[in-house]
Amino acid sequence: MRRPILALALVVALVTVALFVNTLAQGQGLPKSVTIGTNPAGTVYFALASGIAKVVSGGAGYQMVVQPHAGTSTMLPLINTGEMEFGIQNGVDLWLAYRGPAHQIGGRNPFAHTPNVRLVMRGAPLMVGLLVRKDSPIKTVHDVKGKRFTGEYRAHLAGWYNMFGHLSSAGLTWNDVKVVPVNTVNDGVDALLQNRADVTQHALNSAKVKEADAAVGVRHISDDCSPQGEERMKKAVPGYYPRIVKPGAITGVVEDTCVVAYDTYLFAGKAVPDQVVEAALKAVWEGGEQLVPIHPMFKEWTQDRAVDADASIPYHPGAVRFYKERNVWKPGMDQVQQKLLAVNP
């Protein structure tokens, strides 16, 4: 008789604890769950969002659920209107969306105006490299002229800016290549695998690149990292900067390779309550050691990168309060914040 009684007592105790935690969370104004939007499965951002969601769910007092989307253009409107709370995306896309269609890069800004996005934490830089088949004669970006080159990226517009930045580093334009239209970065890799394209791109160490390497063998090729190439890249896409990556730990990198890098943002909607943002930020802030094993990019997702004077969108008030309490909101950041808020008064 004692075992059933003990089992029943254990169940009652667990239910009581769960109810207590839920009541405590509700008392703090926290929801039962929130969503975090990101790119499709197989992308680096999906892996990052999954890691963030795991840590937040374990430490914020509520569950965070990952909601993948085709790309920035489909995800941002949901956060802007409050249908989704959080997102993982790059600072360049957010710069364009926050400022609206009048602000363009390469003559383009197809993002819907998204004035209600707010930065929670600047994370690690995303590194994106041009990708070819392993047996391709193409060695660097200077060899892509006249080649079949994935473009358009109708559902994943960051891909268009990536490719524009790669080309610009070499002083090339879209007119110098044969554009193969694709919808997403994953579709671009599929075009390479199906021999419909000679050159595509993807984030370094993504699941999709690993899949392609296992299927046919692929390698990343270098952009132009000379001082002139760097200047052309930065002028073409503000927020981009070159990175040299070495062979060894990254799939498809067989020699020192120059790639595009740009910052990743954990962000939220303007209407998300301060305490919800602070709870998520606290969990990520204190959970860095849990993040590192999930994906190599989390090695650079550090506390000292969180507050950035070159941020492309304003910080969420909950994040500002969090950083001020920890004395990491540096002198001059209030002026940066006011300048960014003034873009959409």
Locations of regions flagged by a protein language model:
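N-terminal secretory/targeting leader peptides
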Residues: 34-37, 41-45, 53-74, 81-84, ...
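Sec/Tat-exported extracytoplasmic proteins
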Residues: 56-60, 83, 88-91, 98-101, ...
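N-terminal segment of the mature folded domain
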Residues: 80-120
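An extracytoplasmic/periplasmic, membrane-proximal ligand-sensing/linker region
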Residues: 204, 208-225, 232-234, 275-279, ...
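Pocket-lining segment of extracytoplasmic ligand-binding domains
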Residues: 91-93, 100-102, 106-109, 136, ...
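Bilobed "Venus flytrap"/periplasmic-binding protein-like clamshell domains
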Residues: 31-65, 126-194, 308-318, 322
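Ligand-binding clefts/hinges and TM-proximal coupling segments of bilobed small-molecule sensing domains
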Residues: 145-165, 239-300, 305
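Short, low-complexity disordered leader/linker segments with a strong preference
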Residues: 1-31, 345
